[in-house]
C-alpha cells in the first residue's frame, strides 16, 4: 500500500471516528420523503405559483387576479385582440394589458377613480383600432354608449368591424382637432377619454371637454411627451399640461406611466 493511500485512509478514519456516516439526502429526496426544509433551504427554493381567484377591483367595473386586470366580457367567447380569456364561476373575463393600454397602466399605477361607470356615455378621442375602447365597452355595458373618433380611415375600418359586434360603440371618422365637425352627432358625455399624438393635444382635450363633457363628468388625458416636444424632458412637459388643465378643470389624479408606457402620463380631471 502506498504512503498516499495510507494517509487518505487515516484522514477518513479521523473524519468518521471509525464509523460510516450516512449520506445527507438532497432537497428532492427530502421533498419526496415528506421531510421539512431548513430556513436557509426554503429561501433558495423557487417561489411556488399561487392560484388566484378573480376579485372585484376597487376601480368600478374592473376585476383583478393577482396583479392582472380584467373586464367581464360583454361578448363571451370573443377575443378580438387575441387577449387572454379566463372563465371562472360561470363568467368570462378579458385580460387588460398595461403594455397595450394606458388606461390599464394608469390603474396599476394607483389611480382609484377613472370616472367610468356602467351605463355611461363615453367620448373616445383617438380610438385607433379600438383595443382600450373595447374594454371600456365591457365596463359601460349594454346600457352605455361609446363614441369612437379617429381621422385615419385605415384604423377606423378596423374599429367599424369591432363596433358591428359590440352594439354599444359608434364609430365616427372625424378629426378631434375640429369638434365642430361632429357637434350634431355626439351627445353630452359622462366621460371624455383622449389618446392623441398631436402637439396641441392639451388644447384638443380642453375644446372637446368644454363642448361635450357634462357638468360633473370626468376627463382622462393620455399625454405623449415626445409628440409635444422632443427637446424637452417629459416631466417638464407633463407639468406644463397640468398647469393648462388646472385653469379649466379640477385635476383629481396624475400618474406617470413608466415603465409600461414610456414618456407618457395620464391626467384625470373633473368638470
Language-model-derived ranges and their functions:
Residues 117, 140-141, 212-216:
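Helix-to-beta-strand junctions that scaffold the AdoMet/dcAdoMet cofactor pocket
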Residues 2-94:
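N-terminal auxiliary segments of SAM/dcSAM-dependent transferases
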Residues 2-4, 10, 155-158, 203-271:
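C-terminal substrate-binding/active-site "lid" region of AdoMet-derived donor-dependent transferases
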Residues 117-128, 143-147:
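Conserved class I S-adenosyl-L-methionine
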Residues 147-201:
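S-adenosyl-L-methionine
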Amino acid at each position: 500500500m502506498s504512503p498516499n493511500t495510507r494517509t487518505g485512509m487515516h484522514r477518513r478514519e479521523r473524519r468518521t471516528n471509525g464509523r460510516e456516516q450516512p449520506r445527507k439526502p438532497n432537497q428532492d429526496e427530502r421533498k419526496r420523503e415528506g421531510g421539512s426544509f431548513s430556513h436557509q433551504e426554503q429561501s433558495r427554493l423557487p417561489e411556488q405559483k399561487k392560484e388566484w381567484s378573480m376579485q372585484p377591483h376597487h376601480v368600478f367595473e374592473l376585476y383583478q387576479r393577482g396583479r392582472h386586470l380584467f373586464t367581464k366580457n360583454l361578448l363571451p367567447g370573443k377575443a378580438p385582440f387575441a387577449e387572454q380569456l379566463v372563465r371562472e364561476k360561470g363568467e368570462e373575463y378579458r385580460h387588460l394589458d398595461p403594455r397595450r393600454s394606458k388606461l390599464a397602466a394608469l390603474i396599476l399605477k394607483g389611480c382609484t377613480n377613472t370616472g367610468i361607470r356602467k351605463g355611461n356615455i363615453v367620448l373616445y378621442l383617438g380610438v385607433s383600432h379600438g383595443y382600450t375602447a373595447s374594454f371600456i365597452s365591457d365596463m359601460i355595458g349594454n346600457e352605455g354608449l361609446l363614441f369612437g373618433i379617429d381621422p385615419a380611415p385605415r384604423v377606423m375600418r378596423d374599429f367599424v368591424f369591432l363596433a358591428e359586434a359590440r352594439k354599444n360603440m359608434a364609430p365616427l371618422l372625424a378629426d378631434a382637432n375640429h369638434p365642430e365637425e361632429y357637434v350634431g352627432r355626439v351627445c353630452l358625455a359622462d366621460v371624455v377619454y383622449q389618446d392623441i399624438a398631436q402637439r396641441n393635444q392639451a388644447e384638443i382635450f380642453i375644446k372637446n371637454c368644454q363642448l361635450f363633457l357634462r357638468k360633473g363628468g370626468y376627463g382622462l388625458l393620455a399625454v405623449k411627451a415626445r409628440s409635444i416636444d422632443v427637446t424637452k424632458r417629459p416631466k417638464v412637459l407633463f407639468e406644463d399640461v397640468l398647469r393648462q388643465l388646472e385653469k379649466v378643470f379640477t385635476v383629481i389624479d396624475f400618474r406617470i406611466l413608466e415603465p409600461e408606457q414610456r414618456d407618457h402620463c395620464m391626467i384625470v380631471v373633473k368638470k
